[in-house]
UniProtKB/Swiss-Prot annotation:
Location of the protein in the cell: Secreted
Family: Belongs to the frog skin active peptide (FSAP) family. Ranatuerin subfamily.
Record keywords, A-Z: Amphibian defense peptide, Antibiotic, Antimicrobial, Disulfide bond, Fungicide, Secreted
UniProt cross-references to Pfam families, sorted A to Z: Antimicrobial_2
Name of the featured protein: Ranatuerin-2Ca
Top-level taxon of the source organism: Eukaryota
């Protein structure tokens, strides 16, 4: 349903941001 899809989308967003932050810590952030 719509709610589940929205939840999945939000989870993907959060996971993506966490991954980006992790990459920054490991490899160093480049603007």
């Amino acid at each position: 349903g719509l709610f589940l899809d929205t939840l999945k989308g939000a989870a993907k967003d959060v996971a993506g941001k966490l991954l980006e932050g992790l990459k920054c810590k490991i490899a160093g952030c480049k603007p």
